[in-house]
């Protein structure tokens, strides 16, 4: 299995892939044309918000099996095209739950103490 990481990710992602002996490439900042040219060389792709997987990019994918979205939404993935190509799309809706809770509590303290 070979994975493309197309957006910046935590170092923990690389640690997990290495521990599972999964081959991966990190190619961030690619243009849509560059991504379209390389995406079908991979079994999976890990993305965040910066990478947009449009129908044009996904249309000719015959090898891609899974799209992993680090984050809540999948609005940057053309789900109809992924479904047509039988590509599994997954996200991590609870991935930033703790950080969101910490920010919320911090903002409450800020409001209570009139800190701007």
Model-identified regions with their sequence ranges:
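Phosphate/diphosphate ligand-binding glycine-rich loop within oxidoreductases
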Residues: 5, 44-116
């Amino acid at each position: 299995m070979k994975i493309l990481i197309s957006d910046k990710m935590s170092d923990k992602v690389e640690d997990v892939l290495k521990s599972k002996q999964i081959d991966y490439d990190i190619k961030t900042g690619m243009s849509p044309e560059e991504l379209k040219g390389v995406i079908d060389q991979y079994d999976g792709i890990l993305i965040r918000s910066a990478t947009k997987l449009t129908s044009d990019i996904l249309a000719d994918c015959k090898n891609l099996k899974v799209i992993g979205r680090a984050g809540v939404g999948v609005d940057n993935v053309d789900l109809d095209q992924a479904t047509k190509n039988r590509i599994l799309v997954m996200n991590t809706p609870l991935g930033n739950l703790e950080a969101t809770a910490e920010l919320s509590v911090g903002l409450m303290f800020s409001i209570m103490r009139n800190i701007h």
